[in-house]
Amino acid sequence: MKGKFLKVSSLFVATLTTATLVSSPAANALSSKAMDNHPQQTQSSKQQTPKIQKGGNLKPLEQREHANVILPNNDRHQITDTTNGHYAPVTYIQVEAPTGTFIASGVVVGKDTLLTNKHVVDATHGDPHALKAFPSAINQDNYPNGGFTAEQITKYSGEGDLAIVKFSPNEQNKHIGEVVKPATMSNNAETQVNQNITVTGYPGDKPVATMWESKGKITYLKGEAMQYDLSTTGGNSGSPVFNEKNEVIGIHWGGVPNEFNGAVFINENVRNFLKQNIEDIHFANDDQPNNPDNPDNPNNPDNPNNPDEPNNPDNPNNPDNPDNGDTNNSDNPDAA
């Protein structure tokens, strides 16, 4: 199947398996630094605030299929109050490549971190600085939380179309996760087929940099694969999939025309990858008392209040505990 192209204002939308991107020859020149599948760290420093690219001659770019999947359920509506609640971390992305400017979506999940798709970051051709992010963008002239420049990319080691992008602080020395509250991730313990969901992002068939929400239900769920019956188009790649609690349960990648749209489901493997690479990512159950990852959980071995923790003064095996049976312990009344 060949891709189809949609005109968006004076930009164009080009098809990807998982997204349609917008191209404009007005893109800035990129550096020639190379980057493979391994993350490349650049010096963290304040960056000049990027701006949303506008206009440019139409320049279609066919790369992959299945970007625009409009299903019978086409319940999409625009979000105008983009800075409110769980909408705030939803992010408009532009990638400034030598061949043009491409658009996609993402979601802020940490102080300096955003999630999107592998195929979105692939458009940088190895230069993280080519990727710009505009959290809570309202339109191409109004992005209330400014813009940020990427400095490091880490691709998911599994098959899922998922990538982590870290950003430099802006000119005011603010991080992307400080100008908006990062999204809360679901632990997905209760996620199942037929549940109501939304996909929120920046579709390419709508006015540039306008946020839209699509509503539907989960139709399939297995491993890292999630499918649903709602409609999306190119530009939605990297959009967060929210449950009814407004927690992120997956990252949208695209779909198959007349069949389904899909996302990388945040299962245990994906969750472990995210926790290993994003220190401050927040999952909904992290602060629950029975969560073994909660430092306040008395059963957490790293919790000093855990009776089995060697550094717990109440632990009889603690050498500083006067009740310690160690006869060499000067604090032990039975010591010689």
Swiss-Prot record:
SUPFAM superfamilies: Trypsin-like serine proteases (SSF50494). The active site is at H119 (charge relay system), D161 (charge relay system), S237 (charge relay system). Proteolytically cleaved by aureolysin (aur). This cleavage leads to the activation of SspA. Gene3D superfamilies: Trypsin-like serine proteases. One of its GO terms (molecular function) is serine-type endopeptidase activity. Residues 289-324 are annotated as: 11 X 3 AA repeats of P-[DN]-N. Residues 30-68 form a propeptide. Keywords: Hydrolase, Protease, Repeat, Secreted, Serine protease, Signal, Virulence, Zymogen. Residues 1-29 form the signal peptide. GO terms for biological process: proteolysis. It catalyses: Preferential cleavage: Glu-|-Xaa, Asp-|-Xaa. Belongs to the peptidase S1B family. The cascade of activation of extracellular proteases proceeds from the metalloprotease aureolysin (aur), through SspA to SspB. This is Glutamyl endopeptidase. It comes from Staphylococcus aureus (strain COL).
